[in-house]
Amino acid sequence: MASSAFVKFTCALVMCMMVAAPLAEAITCGLVASKLAPCIGYLQGAPGPSAACCGGIKSLNSAAASPADRKTACTCLKSAATSIKGINYGKAASLPRQCGVSVPYAISPNTNCNAIH
């Protein structure tokens, strides 16, 4: 009888843990914008990316784990780049390297986001 109660308790506990477990944060354009906002100064001419900028790049790179996430991030980056005046696209392309991050595609307004895997 005690083992039956234990099994029921364990099942209930596991179900509660599954329901209460936080969902993975999906990539959104809002997330991309907030992570990369500290980089705007560098992209518009400041001499080097700030620690906050590189932290955002690293965080975004870690969050974009799936191909769908990377495609979304790419699309958001392209959209944001066209709405911000004075972006130096050469600096944008070098930003991941400047921050020690490897990105599997070129950072460019001409990048085909649908080809990202």
Swiss-Prot record:
Protein name: Non-specific lipid-transfer protein
PROSITE patterns (UniProt xref): PLANT_LTP
Role this protein plays: Plant non-specific lipid-transfer proteins transfer phospholipids as well as galactolipids across membranes. May play a role in wax or cutin deposition in the cell walls of expanding epidermal cells and certain secretory tissues. Also has fungicide activity.
GO BP terms in the entry: defense response to fungus; killing of cells of another organism; lipid transport
Gene name in the database record: IWF1'
Lineage of the organism: Eukaryota, Viridiplantae, Streptophyta, Embryophyta, Tracheophyta
Similarity section: Belongs to the plant LTP family.
Keywords attached to this entry: Antimicrobial, Disulfide bond, Fungicide, Lipid-binding, Plant defense, Signal, Transport
An example Gene Ontology molecular-function term: lipid binding
Signal peptide boundaries: 1-26
Superkingdom of origin: Eukaryota
Disulfide bonds: 29-76, 39-53, 54-99, 74-113
Keyword Transport: yes
